[in-house]
Regions:
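Bacterial N-terminal signal peptides
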Residues: 8-18
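C-terminal "post-core" interaction segments
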Residues: 22-209
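N-terminal secretory signal peptides that target proteins for export/translocation
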Residues: 1-4
Length: 209
């Protein structure tokens, strides 16, 4: 018979392994072979395996600070993974760590990589997006809160549609409608992510992917 103490030891190690296991990265499928991956733990969150022809990855390094060793791992991974038929769109901003930004500047000179973001002190992307820092942060956080990714790419996604039915709706009923039924304000547009999305769709339209 196995002693109770053995069960306790086994339970302890199982709990320790569960605690040590990294959380799965936040990913979203944007369609047409485009996948978004938010990098919060480097290098653990980097996708594994070789590139798939026709697949494009958006890797989001915004607000991530990583050490020199992690940045060096990213450099090796990008050099192995990036190519013109399976490009990498790398999102960064002024708050991305200095070691990571140094790597991004280096890989941007190669083929198959495009660095995209809102310019700021010490950060000049290849493809610039326009956004205020507070709006960018709010849009970035909205995805963590569970907002649909497409709502961060489309202007006024929550705007009520004005059609014949709404025009014929009795005014009295409109006045009696509870405030809770009001249209939910749309989250801010994620300008950098939107820029990457539009670039991908343009390349697809030109049959370059």
């Amino acid at each position: 018979m196995i002693r109770t103490g053995a069960f306790q030891v086994a339970a302890f190690w199982l709990a320790a392994l569960a605690t040590a296991a990294p959380a799965a990265p936040l990913t979203r499928d944007l369609g047409d072979g485009l996948t978004y991956v938010r990098i919060r733990d480097l290098p653990a969150d980097l996708p594994g395996g070789a590139a798939v022809p026709g697949q494009t990855l958006i890797l989001d390094f915004r607000y991530l600070v990583a050490g020199r060793d992690a940045a060096a791992t990213l450099l090796a991974w990008v050099e192995f993974r990036a190519n013109a038929r399976s490009p990498l769109f790398l999102l960064a901003n002024r708050e991305t760590g200095a070691d990571l930004n140094a790597v991004l500047r280096r890989v941007s000179r190669g083929k198959g990589c495009v660095v995209i973001g809102v310019p700021g002190p010490g950060f000049e992307p290849q493809l610039a997006a326009k956004s205020e820092p507070a709006a960018e942060r709010e849009a970035y956080s909205a995805l963590e809160r569970g907002e649909p990714v497409m709502s961060l790419l489309t202007e006024n996604p929550g705007k009520a549609r004005l059609d014949e039915a709404s025009l014929n709706h009795p005014p009295a009923e409109e006045e009696d409608a509870p405030a809770a039924d009001a249209v939910k304000p749309a989250p801010p547009i994620d300008a950098a992510l939107q820029r990457a999305f539009h670039l991908h769709r343009s390349l697809r339209a030109l049959r370059r992917l």
